[in-house]
Each structure stands twice: as C-alpha cells, then as structure tokens.
C-alpha cells in the first residue's frame, strides 16, 4: 500500500467537486513552499536536526523549492485576476534533497561532507516538480528567489 494515496485521492476528489460545483473558484496547488516561520517542512526540520548535531536526510529524491515570498506574489496576482482555474504554484527547477541539505549545512558553517543519506520513507515520490507553464502565462512571474538566497534567509530566521 502507498500511504500517499490517502493524501492524493481525497485531494483530487475535492478539487473535482469544487470545479463542478457551479461556484466561482480558484484552486492553487502549492509545491514545496519554504521560508521563515514555517514548520513541518524539510528545510526547517533539517535545520533543527543540524542544530542538534544530526546531519542526515531520509532519501535523496528531487523536489522543486519555492520561496514563500514568490508564492505570495504569484497568489496575489492569481486571486486578483483569475477564477475557475486550477493552477500549480511553485518553481520548475528540480534539486536533489542532498544538494539542499548541503547548502543548508554550508550556511550553518557545518562541513557538508558530514551528510548521511538514509533510506527514504515508503511511498515517497521520487520526484515532485510542478508544471508551471500556466502560472507563468497568467502571472508573468519568472523572477524567482535563488535557492541559496531563500535558504539563507530561512536558516538565519531559525538560528
């Protein structure tokens, strides 16, 4: 059994219900948004582990990371100008989790060679990267915060 089904199937059913309700709607699917103040996300959880001297990740899948300020700007444009759509908000650039972990370690002054890659969770997607064609067309947004800069701001907020 894949534990992700318990998340993705109800989500898809809910989106379908809303889209067929006859009401005005805007469904925004956020992909790996990170930034200061967030909890329960890889970046924040890894920083906390590093503060405890634990330098490991679970799996080395790929993800696209979107800094919170970028997600807010895209959302603002979408909400003000569009309806009756389902839109992915995120960044197209895919990065291995180990690369992100090593960047975080470098920002924290920890030798990235200390990183240990452990087995990942059962059922975890090997890659998670949105198709951002529609959000770019609708918002014109292309000025993403560079990953290194967003990570630096996030890490500094957690130290």
Residue ranges and their predicted role:
Residues 42, 71, 96-108, 150-154:
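PAPS/PAP-binding and catalytic site of the sulfotransferase fold
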Residues 133, 147-159:
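Amphipathic terminal alpha-helices
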Residues 31-32, 86-89:
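Short-chain dehydrogenase/reductase
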Residues 5, 38-41, 63-69, 95, ...:
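Residue-level signal for the nucleotide or nucleotide-sugar donor/cofactor binding architecture
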Residues 6, 10-13:
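Active-site helix of classical SDR
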Residues 16-64, 68-72, 77, 103-105:
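NAD(P)-dependent short-chain dehydrogenase/reductase
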Residues 58, 86-87, 95-101, 109-127, ...:
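C-terminal "lid/loop" region of Rossmann-like NAD(P)-dependent oxidoreductases
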Residues 92:
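Conserved short acidic donor-positioning loop in nucleotide-sugar-dependent glycosyltransferases
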């Amino acid at each position: 059994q894949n534990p992700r089904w318990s998340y993705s199937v109800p989500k898809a059913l809910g989106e379908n219900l809303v889209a067929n309700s006859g009401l005005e709607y805007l469904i925004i699917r956020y992909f790996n948004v990170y930034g200061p103040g967030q909890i329960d996300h890889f970046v924040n959880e890894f920083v906390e582990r590093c503060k405890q001297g634990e330098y490991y990740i679970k799996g080395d899948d790929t993800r696209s990371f979107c800094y919170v300020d970028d997600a807010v700007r895209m959302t603002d444009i979408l909400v003000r100008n569009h309806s009756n759509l389902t839109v992915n908000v995120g960044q197209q650039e895919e990065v291995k989790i180990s690369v992100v972990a090593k960047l975080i370690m470098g920002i924290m002054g920890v030798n990235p060679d200390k990183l240990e890659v452990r087995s990942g969770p059962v059922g975890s997607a090997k890659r998670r990267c949105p198709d951002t064609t529609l959000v770019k067309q609708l918002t014109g947004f292309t000025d993403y915060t560079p990953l290194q800069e967003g990570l630096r701001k996030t890490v500094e907020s957690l130290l």
